[in-house]
Amino acid sequence: MMQLLQLLLGLLGPGGYLFLLGDCQEVTTLTVKYQVSEEVPSGTVIGKLSQELGREERRRQAGAAFQVLQLPQALPIQVDSEEGLLSTGRRLDREQLCRQWDPCLVSFDVLATGDLALIHVEIQVLDINDHQPRFPKGEQELEISESASLRTRIPLDRALDPDTGPNTLHTYTLSPSEHFALDVIVGPDETKHAELIVVKELDREIHSFFDLVLTAYDNGNPPKSGTSLVKVNVLDSNDNSPAFAESSLALEIQEDAAPGTLLIKLTATDPDQGPNGEVEFFLSKHMPPEVLDTFSIDAKTGQVILRRPLDYEKNPAYEVDVQARDLGPNPIPAHCKVLIKVLDVNDNIPSIHVTWASQPSLVSEALPKDSFIALVMADDLDSGHNGLVHCWLSQELGHFRLKRTNGNTYMLLTNATLDREQWPKYTLTLLAQDQGLQPLSAKKQLSIQISDINDNAPVFEKSRYEVSTRENNLPSLHLITIKAHDADLGINGKVSYRIQDSPVAHLVAIDSNTGEVTAQRSLNYEEMAGFEFQVIAEDSGQPMLASSVSVWVSLLDANDNAPEVVQPVLSDGKASLSVLVNASTGHLLVPIETPNGLGPAGTDTPPLATHSSRPFLLTTIVARDADSGANGEPLYSIRSGNEAHLFILNPHTGQLFVNVTNASSLIGSEWELEIVVEDQGSPPLQTRALLRVMFVTSVDHLRDSARKPGALSMSMLTVICLAVLLGIFGLILALFMSICRTEKKDNRAYNCREAESTYRQQPKRPQKHIQKADIHLVPVLRGQAGEPCEVGQSHKDVDKEAMMEAGWDPCLQAPFHLTPTLYRTLRNQGNQGAPAESREVLQDTVNLLFNHPRQRNASRENLNLPEPQPATGQPRSRPLKVAGSPTGRLAGDQGSEEAPQRPPASSATLRRQRHLNGKVSPEKESGPRQILRSLVRLSVAAFAERNPVEELTVDSPPVQQISQLLSLLHQGQFQPKPNHRGNKYLAKPGGSRSAIPDTDGPSARAGGQTDPEQEEGPLDPEEDLSVKQLLEEELSSLLDPSTGLALDRLSAPDPAWMARLSLPLTTNYRDNVISPDAAATEEPRTFQTFGKAEAPELSPTGTRLASTFVSEMSSLLEMLLEQRSSMPVEAASEALRRLSVCGRTLSLDLATSAASGMKVQGDPGGKTGTEGKSRGSSSSSRCL
């Protein structure tokens, strides 16, 4: 912007240069804008005008000055005359400068005499949050009847905030109240006021008044607020209150309305009779005093009357709050808002102010057109069109004009070059008129004196010069002479010439004194047909005046370019053309052009089209000529080679025809034609070309094309590419199918090492090696009829036989978990209020169920199988722990030593033996069967205790719940199923292929290998029994001693039941693998020892799985018994007595058979023994 301003200050254009010789100057207008916050300290710098104009150093040297043409008196701004420094002279208050306008803009003009610029300065005064919202009164008093309906609205005083923008009034809040709420209403003029709303019925007897705090907030940073106390007095109820026809009204009034003018008549009705129905009107006392002084209302008629004249410039709008109330006691006033908008009236005459750029009325004739003379400001206090002023000049010659800059400000400019010799003085009339309906105008006389100066610039004889010359001229050729005249005298009239810089300025030159223009070099029409340049004429005056003119030079073409053949393509001035002839018919076919002059080109066979018409078009010769007009129009002719007149050449189009119908006789012949292309210039230029035409048959052409190597056609390339792509796709598809088939085949068998390799390739899991020790063999857990406890063991040692002879039965070593709560419940029920006979029977039953000589039992966290220990003598009894601890240790003599434990010699898997009779003798009943019967007894006892009045049935919910856990005891096989993330052992149906090798005693193969034919043997169909059938047989066998318990008929394992086990899990997945009858070993197990190392001896009794199921049953019974711990024990004693009799009948009374190994001593109430104490057969045994 500054550079453009400087350029404009240096040049005027076609009229000449700007200059400053007198008091008046030509000025370029410039608008600058500044911002300043209000309340800044005095002397704050706002801006610097010299920086806006640039070239400060030059201005200092030239003594530049800044002159304020107009400065509003209300704006305390100081302008430095040397550098144009703008600063505040005193305190700035935006509310005083622009009370009702936002943004607040204050403008004035400054003339920079040394820079030839008129600067229009606009200063925006920014508002700061220096005022807080204020209410007209700090306390408002309202009256409302207690019978006021809900949603009744009461207007409140409006807060005033003189700030603008975000600093002005933003919202209202009301102190918490359950009877009143606040609603903020935004008016048409964006004003905000609050209304009090009744949200809960009022009761004067409860609350006769309310004190509420109304707070008004602005949106400044930080926000400011103002408060007002609102006192609401609750009056006795009045049946009805007046009602306005409309709650809010808006009207307009001219500002020139006379006092006493009726503005509006309000009406309100009250349905009451008498004084309660008479309505009177009054203005709200909460309105500003200015409103109360300007308007009044008749109390009886409701007429709103103007009291004093209005002035739109002071207040353009008023808001009047009118209330109406009846004359009854405790009236409820009704409210109506009346918005009065004042319409501006053209009642102000424009005023004219003239500020001269220099000393008054003296203007130099040196000023060019559009030079600044003075600043004219027209002002009108009206608004809108009434305040828009239009100014114009009344003059005879029209040498001056007015130009609007902004608003009502004009510049007086020169409209022509002034000439003192002709008009030494001008008298102008300045008129100003507003744009109102009834416009008002003003006028002012201006007298201007003209001073003499060098005011004439050189003037050319023509406004534009044109000249023509032929190309290929000689250097220094005279083109034209330019003439300019200057009306000034002396050196001011001496003119010099020069050519303005341009891209073509180097082609010509001009004599600075005579104006003769010459060519500097030879010109070429083909490069440019013409060019234009500017010639500037300057006088010698001070300042120098100049003018310019445009000169156009057009070139005439000369025939200096010969035609050039572009088709067919020539090689060394030669081209060949092969014409195909059908040997049988003699018809001509489509010819083939050869640009190399050696014969047919290309290997593609062209599409053949027979032409039997006469003459036949062979080709079209095309030539180009760079010249224009007749110099560029070629003519074609055959100079030689066409003596037989076989060929015809069109001289204008260049089409070559063969004049023959049957071309059979021409096969094998060659013709050389000399073609001449000549333009029509003077003198003409020509080009020669040799065209060889050969007539060949189509068969010979195809044979020749096949012999010669060439590029494949596009169609052939496409076919080859498609074939290659299809072949590649077929190979990829075959390879993919082969890989998929191989993977499918490999997935049919499990390979430990492949699983380990696959597991190692898992990217998201830490690699874990699968070793032989991670795969455990799970034997079949089933008690078979007629099968002793030593089935599946290949070796018997002498120590075990000695223990059997001493009365130790390994079948009884199965660990049985009894929770403390269940033990205490059974014992306490036998001692609380039961007769001696019942206690004796209960004690016998307890002995029968729990007092078995047992190995130290493993907890749920450590499920290790017990090892048998030989009985070295008669064990001595050892007292049990007290009643609070159900578990105790049975120990022998102090000198007895614990028998050493050693693992069995074989690791053969147990295999269930089938029996034909399907019966089990009570004398040879195995350990799991006795455990099962003990569980049934506990189940029946718990059921009888919980439901003593109900009858025992198979379909009872508790029995069904217990039967589900009992069925788990019969669940059979488990097999390892390796997973890439660890081994997950799932139950496998009995009819499926077993992953555990079966062995038949000593015939088991070494390393756990078995015969494949034995792996897929089906089980007995009798095994497919439901849980309900199994439970019915067990209960019937228990209550009927003559019937045995068919334990060999097992149900198929169900993985759903396996999922119900709440086995304790550890972080090491290897500890969670169930391996019944497998003794703990410290020997390392790897893949190298897989199937070779000897496994510990397996035992069909006392398995860890059975112990876990018994623990589950114990927990179930504990929950059942705890729910009815206060139940009388008569029913339980009777049930236990029956169970004891059935047990003795079935030879299950283990208390007698184990008398040699353990004795229970009870001395309730001071008898022979102490309750809860017992003696075991080994120091490592545990009594549950």
Curated annotation (Swiss-Prot):
Residues 740-1184 are cytoplasmic. The keyword Transit peptide does not apply. One of its GO terms (biological process) is cell adhesion. Residues 1012-1023 have a biased composition (Acidic residues). Residues 1-24 form the signal peptide. Residues 854-928, 973-1023, 1153-1184 are annotated as: Disordered. It comes from the Eukaryota. Keywords: Calcium, Cell adhesion, Cell junction, Cell membrane, Disease variant, Epilepsy, Glycoprotein, Intellectual disability, Membrane, Phosphoprotein, Primary microcephaly, Repeat, Secreted, Signal, Transmembrane, Transmembrane helix. Changing residue 332 to N: In DMJDS1; uncertain significance. Expressed in highly vascularized tissues including the heart and placenta, but most tissues contain a low level of expression. Prominent expression in the spleen. Present in villous and extravillous trophoblast (at protein level). The modification Phosphoserine is found at residues 859, 1062. Residues 25-718 are extracellular. GO terms for molecular function: calcium ion binding. PROSITE patterns: CADHERIN_1, CADHERIN_2. Cellular adhesion molecule that may play an important role in cell-cell interactions at interendothelial junctions. Acts as a regulator of cell migration, probably via increasing cell-cell adhesion. Promotes homotypic calcium-dependent aggregation and adhesion and clusters at intercellular junctions. Unable to bind to catenins, weakly associates with the cytoskeleton. PANTHER family: CADHERIN-87A (PTHR24028), PROTOCADHERIN-12 (PTHR24028:SF42). It is linked to Diencephalic-mesencephalic junction dysplasia syndrome 1: An autosomal recessive syndrome characterized by severe global developmental delay with profound intellectual disability, spasticity or dystonia, and congenital microcephaly. Brain imaging shows hypothalamic midbrain dysplasia, diencephalic-mesencephalic dysplasia, and intracerebral calcifications. This is Protocadherin-12.
